[in-house]
A protein has these predicted regions:
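Beta1/beta-strand and adjacent pyrophosphate-binding region of the FAD-binding site
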Residues: 2-14
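N-terminal Rossmann-fold NAD(P) dinucleotide-binding loop
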Residues: 17
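Conserved N-terminal/central alpha/beta ligand/cofactor-binding core
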Residues: 23, 29-30, 34-119, 160, ...
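Flavin (FAD/FMN)-binding glycine-rich loop and adjacent Rossmann-like elements that form
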Residues: 43, 113, 135-141, 145-530, ...
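Conserved beta-strand-loop-beta-strand element in the redox core of flavoprotein oxidoreductases
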Residues: 121-136
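Structural detector for short beta-strands of small beta-barrel domains
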Residues: 533-551
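OB-fold (S1/OB) nucleic-acid-binding surfaces
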Residues: 549-573
Length: 611
């Protein structure tokens, strides 16, 4: 047993843990990252979700998430605009290599792969060390970045698992009492992703064999409402490959999901989930033809990935975890938009100074925007809406994560940074998404490094110091306040981020900051910095603009060799283009600079000009 010491120990190499370790090390902390698998990145890579959701608007592409998109664009010449479920689809291998390269570039970051936590030592309510099969690591600060919050159970840190009734948090969508759904599916269903491949017309892919438990009737009608092509193109990847993460009678698996809490029973659940996906892939091949088979060269094979590897992700895509009982709990109403607004209220805490002075402090440290999305094999549930039309399409309304939700209520020297933060079951449907978890991890890593610098506990850390460190990071500055009209490249970005941190009561309900009148203007519509990280080549597309309804646009293509005469949905992720679309006259002839996504039937506009 090798004994190691560090300033910061990050347990788990998933989405949040990878970001946390990178950020802590970049800040200068001696950091050890211990991962169960040979790939870093979790949901974004080893779990196969190479079509991330949320934070797609340019103004929300900040921090490590924004840097990841930029690096994907640089390394994937085919661009990122392939499927229709996301604006960013990529080869999982490319994503994993990006994270590995970033880690390798940090000499004060020691990465150990192939180890899972087995014991946690807690002395006087303080986590002191974590034991793995071959190592014991003692650190000043420990970050639980495991997929299922395993350190919480091992260290007997108070946590939640499953549904809360409406009486607990007064959440509008929470159940009034237990019901068959809450009892059968205590948490959201995981999905074991598989990547399939089109071998080409006239080609025959190897047969996908039946798993030990095969019941194709479970998938009856899975894509009837979509058609074969649209079903496959949902998660289309480069190279005629398809991410299979299908929510409608597909490969979500939640039977006996409570078994994940038991190390002894977890393997049984994992086997069933893996077989469930294999059965679905076999059905796809049988119904759509033998030109479709497994993409067997995606994930590493062997060792820790005994159930996964090849075409199958190394582990399931976990949507929910054990969740710490933190200094505050993020609830459904905390992520819903303000009345007559399109952003959630900022999280406010009262900071007392002595007996007479107190002030309201905004402790936002990460930004998300995904709609509240819950997955249960039995189907959708009724949820309070948190979506809006923007840029010609539906998107989620922005919200923030409070720092206090990363800090356990009683336990010191510990932070959460995955889906294990202090959040209700209902709100978890929006906080679990990959870009936001990167942001949570980045904040946790920075907080841990600052605690080492300040020689303080996470609960004692000055949150304004943390926010300033995140905003001013020299490599990947990240937003803590969602501003829909201001990308991080804008010269006013830092000013308005700090302005609303200092004056949270002034935060606008529409998420739009005013233009300053100090001689500094926001970026122009033609600024190259406003081009999102989605494509490798842009096209000039001419056509007739049509407005079907509010924020619902099309373009009848008039001059394009490949697309002439076609009607494409016209969408954008750019604030300036969004504003132009709002005022463009129907039947106007326009030139659009953008990329065409044949899977989604849309033209993603980076700039638009009337002609």
């Amino acid at each position: 047993m090798q004994e190691l010491t560090a300033d910061v120990l990050v347990v788990g190499g998933g989405t949040g843990g990878t970001a946390a370790a990178i950020q802590a090390a970049r800040r200068g902390a001696k950091t050890i990252l211990v991962s169960e698998f040979s790939w870093l990145g979790g949901m974004l890579t080893s779990a196969g979700v190479a079509a991330p959701d949320g934070n797609e608007l340019i103004a929300l592409q900040t921090g490590i998430w924004g840097a990841f998109l930029q690096e994907l664009t640089r390394r994937q010449p085919e661009g990122l605009n392939h499927g229709w479920v996301s604006f960013f689809t990529y080869d999982p291998c490319v994503g994993a290599q990006i994270f590995a390269d970033w880690v390798a570039a940090l000499p004060n970051l020691h990465w150990i792969a192939g180890q899972a936590p087995e014991a946690v030592s807690v002395q006087e309510n303080r986590v002191t060390e974590v034991t793995f099969r071959d190592y014991t690591v003692r650190a000043k600060l420990t970050i639980d970045a495991t997929e299922l919050g395993d350190l919480l159970a091992l260290g007997e840190v108070p946590y939640r698992w499953g549904w809360e009734l409406q009486e607990e948090f007064d959440e509008p969508s929470a159940p009034l009492q237990p019901n068959p759904l809450t009892q059968q599916y205590p948490v959201q269903a995981p999905t074991w992703v598989v990547v399939m491949q089109d071998y080409g017309e006239g080609e025959t892919a190897p047969e996908i064999l039946a798993p030990p438990r095969d019941d194709p009737d479970r998938f009856a009608g899975a894509w009837d409402d979509y058609g074969d092509d649209r079903f496959l193109n949902y998660g289309r990847l480069p190279g005629n490959r398809f991410m299979i993460n299908w929510p409608v009678k597909g490969n979500d698996y939640g039977e006996g999901v409570d078994r994940l809490l038991s190390i002894e029973q977890r393997q049984e659940f994992l086997c069933e989930a893996r077989w469930h996906t294999q059965s679905f892939a076999r059905l796809i091949q049988m119904q759509l033809g033998r030109r479709y088979g497994l993409a067997t060269d995606i994930f590493p094979v062997g060792g820790e990935a005994s159930l996964g590897g090849g075409a199958y992700a190394l582990h399931p895509y976990y949507r929910e975890s054990r969740r710490i009982q933190g200094l505050t709990t993020l609830r459904e109403q905390d992520i819903l938009p303000l009345s007559k607004g399109c952003v959630a209220p900022l999280p406010i805490t009262v900071s007392a100074q002595g007996c007479t002075q107190a002030e309201n402090v905004c402790d936002a440290i990460a930004v998300g925007n995904y709609p509240n999305d819950h997955h249960y094999p039995s189907g959708d549930i009724a949820l309070k809406p948190k979506s809006m039309r923007w840029g010609g399409r539906w998107t989620g309304t922005p919200f923030t994560i409070p720092y206090r939700s990363l800090v356990p209520i009683h336990t010191d020297s510990l932070l959460a940074c995955e889906k294990n933060l202090s959040v209700s079951h209902m709100a978890n449907g929006a906080t679990r998404l990959q870009p936001l978890v990167l942001g949570i991890g980045q904040a946790a890593g920075m907080a841990a490094a600052l605690c080492v610098e300040q020689d303080c506990q996470p609960r004692e850390l000055n949150v304004r110091l943390l926010q300033e460190a995140l905003l001013s990071d020299t490599i990947a500055p990240t937003a803590v306040i969602p501003l829909l009209n201001l990308p991080a490249s804008d010269p006013d970005w830092h000013y308005w981020q700090r302005y609303y941190l200092d004056r949270p009561d002034a935060y606008p309900a529409d998420g739009y900051c005013p233009k300053r009148t100090l001689g500094i203007s926001t970026s122009s519509p033609q600024s190259l910095s406003s081009i999102p990280a989605t494509t490798s080549a842009l096209l000039d597309v001419y056509g007739t603009f049509q407005k079907k309804a509010d924020q619902d646009y099309t373009l009848m293509v008039t001059t394009s060799i490949a697309f002439q005469g076609q009607v494409l949905k016209l969408v954008t992720l750019d604030h300036h283009v969004n504003q132009q679309l709002l005022v463009t006259t129907p039947h106007q002839q326009v030139k659009v600079l953008g990329t065409i996504n044949t899977s989604g039937g849309w033209l993603l506009a980076e700039a638009i000009e009337r002609i």
